[in-house]
Amino acid sequence: MFMATDKGTVKKTNLEDFNSARKVGLIAITLDENEQLIGVELTDGNSEIILATRNGIAIRFDEQDVRPMGRTAHGVRGIQLNYGDEVVAMDSVTSENSEVLTATEQGLGKRTSVSEYRKQTRGGKGVINIKVNEKTGIVIGMKVITPGQEIMTVSYTHLRAHET
């Protein structure tokens, strides 16, 4: 299981560590004050991870760069964030022909081949994913998709279905 927080922290924990669930639940990750969990992925241990930030930066790295940790561990740095930036989305990549779909608050979307995101080591600065400005607004989401996958976008005023 792979987790990411808005502060750029990532953590990998073996699923077997959650076998002894109780009625009150289990601690999966220790968060700092004002830190939020933004994503959890079930991975095979050999995937690649992409993190996307609100200011248009993304990083792609091997899941194997993160060692498995115990349930109560905090995690390690997945991306080095610029001041005021935060991670808004995380996804795993299982195929090199996948694409990254990035959405902004002004309703714009960008579809980019995963191969255009050079692979870095965990904790790097990342690359420009999408230029953020007044026209685009900040990044609100990112998802790894496959060619031909149907995508539905929903906003407060429109409902659209697109086949990509």
Where are these regions (language model features)?
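Conserved structured catalytic cores and adjacent interaction surfaces
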Residues: 1-127, 136-150, 156
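Conserved small/polar residues in nucleotide/adenosyl-binding loops
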Residues: 157-164
